[in-house]
Amino acid sequence: MQIIDRRRVFDGHYKVNQLIVQDGDVQLKREQFAPGKAVAALVYDTARQLYVLTRQFRIGPEAEIAEIAAGMIDGDEAPETAVRREIHEELGYEVDKLEKIVEMWPSPGTSSEIITVFYAEVSRKTGDGGGLAEENEKIEMLDFTKETLLAEPLQDAKTVIAVQWLRLRG
């Protein structure tokens, strides 16, 4: 299969491309959700010995869900820089230690989005968190012990992956 044409068909808060894919003698028309690159982090507060997640309303499930801190990479920003910014915006912490868990396509059948997932250790809260007012973010912070986090019925894929990584570490 080979992409022979690409055209932006929607350019709003998110972007959608229309691709023409050559498959032998057949040309297929496919839509591609193109939100950009994102970062996420499982955050551990070493001073309080608690994992800190977020809860906010999400359009996909049309509900509030618990998930790890996450956000979009701005322009040519490095993933490490973006995740530090997002942790401060959403949770109010400065990052002490950062470890990459995985770079992944969360939904490669329909989306070009790539998410880099990190583990972050924090100990200094220098902001309020809760998200940015200008982005209309209303983010609640949730604290978990390791045991309660491992038992939490999570539904967000990047969060499930980060918590499974934690479980495998022992």
Language model segments and positions:
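Acidic, metal-coordinating catalytic segment for phosphate/diphosphate chemistry
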Residues: 7-42, 47-48
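Short, solvent-exposed loop/turn elements at beta->coil junctions and helix N-caps
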Residues: 7-9, 102-107
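Active-site-adjacent beta-strand/loop module that shapes the phosphate/pyrophosphate-binding cleft
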Residues: 15-26, 107-127
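Short loop segments at secondary-structure junctions
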Residues: 24-25, 45-48, 57, 120-125, ...
